[in-house]
C-alpha cells in the first residue's frame, strides 16, 4: 500500500515542473521539516527524482549545533549527497534582530552556491503552519487585507527559483510521516524560547 503522504508529495512535486535528474539545492536545518523533505525527494519515483544537493548553515545559536553539523555530514556521506556547509560565527551575531540576520546570512549563502554551481532550484521546507503564521504576523502588525498574502510556493530567487513543495502539508502530517519512517532529526531548541514574535504566536496558538 502506497504511503498517502508520499503520493500527495509526488502530486505537489509534479506541479513544480522540475525535470527529472535536474540538480536541486535543498536548504536543511536538521529539523523535522527539512529532513522529511530530503526523505520525500529521495523516495520519488526515478522518472521524477531530481539530483539532490544539500546546503546547511551552523548558526552557532544552539549548544547542539556541533551535533547537528556532524549528523548532516554523516547523513550526506551515507546517502551520497553533495553537502555545502557554512558557519555564522558568533562574533558576527547582532545584539538585536538575530533571527532576521540569521535568515539573511543563510539566504546569501544559498544564493552564492547557486551562482557558483549553476543550480537553478532552491528548495525549502516551509509548510502550511508556517503559511498561517506568516499571515497572522502580518495581521498583528497591522497589514491591510490586500497585503495579507502568505508564502508563495514558487518565486524568483537570485539566478533561479525558490520552491516550497511542502506548503500544502501540515506540521503534524510531516511529523507523523517522520515517525512512521523513522526519520532522524533534531528538535529546534530555539522554538522553546518565547522572545520572537513568530514563536510567541506559535505558543499562544498551541495554548488554545
Protein language model features and the residues they cover:
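Core alpha/beta nucleotide-donor-binding catalytic domains of modification enzymes
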Residues: 1-203
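Conserved small/polar residues in nucleotide/adenosyl-binding loops
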Residues: 206-208
Amino acid at each position: 500500500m502506497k504511503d498517502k503522504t508520499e503520493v500527495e508529495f509526488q502530486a505537489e512535486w509534479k506541479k513544480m515542473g522540475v525535470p527529472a535528474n535536474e540538480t536541486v539545492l535543498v536548504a536543511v536545518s536538521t529539523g523535522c521539516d527539512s529532513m522529511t523533505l530530503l526523505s520525500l525527494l529521495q523516495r520519488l519515483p526515478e522518472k521524477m527524482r531530481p539530483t539532490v544537493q544539500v546546503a546547511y548553515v551552523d548558526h552557532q545559536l544552539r549548544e547542539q549545533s556541533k551535533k547537528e553539523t556532524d549528523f548532516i555530514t554523516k547523513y550526506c556521506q551515507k546517502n551520497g549527497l553533495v553537502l555545502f556547509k557554512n558557519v555564522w560565527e558568533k562574533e558576527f551575531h547582532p545584539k538585536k534582530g538575530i533571527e532576521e540576520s540569521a535568515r539573511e546570512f543563510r539566504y546569501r549563502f544559498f544564493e552564492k552556491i547557486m551562482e557558483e554551481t549553476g543550480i537553478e532550484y532552491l528548495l525549502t521546507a516551509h509548510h502550511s503552519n508556517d503559511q498561517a503564521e506568516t499571515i497572522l504576523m502580518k495581521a498583528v502588525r497591522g497589514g491591510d487585507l490586500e497585503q495579507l498574502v502568505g508564502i508563495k510556493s514558487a518565486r524568483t530567487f537570485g539566478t533561479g527559483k525558490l520552491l516550497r513543495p511542502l506548503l500544502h502539508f501540515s506540521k503534524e502530517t510531516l511529523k507523523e510521516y517522520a515517525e512512521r519512517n523513522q526519520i532522524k532529526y533534531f528538535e529546534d531548541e530555539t522554538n522553546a524560547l518565547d522572545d520572537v514574535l513568530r514563536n510567541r504566536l506559535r505558543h499562544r496558538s498551541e495554548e488554545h
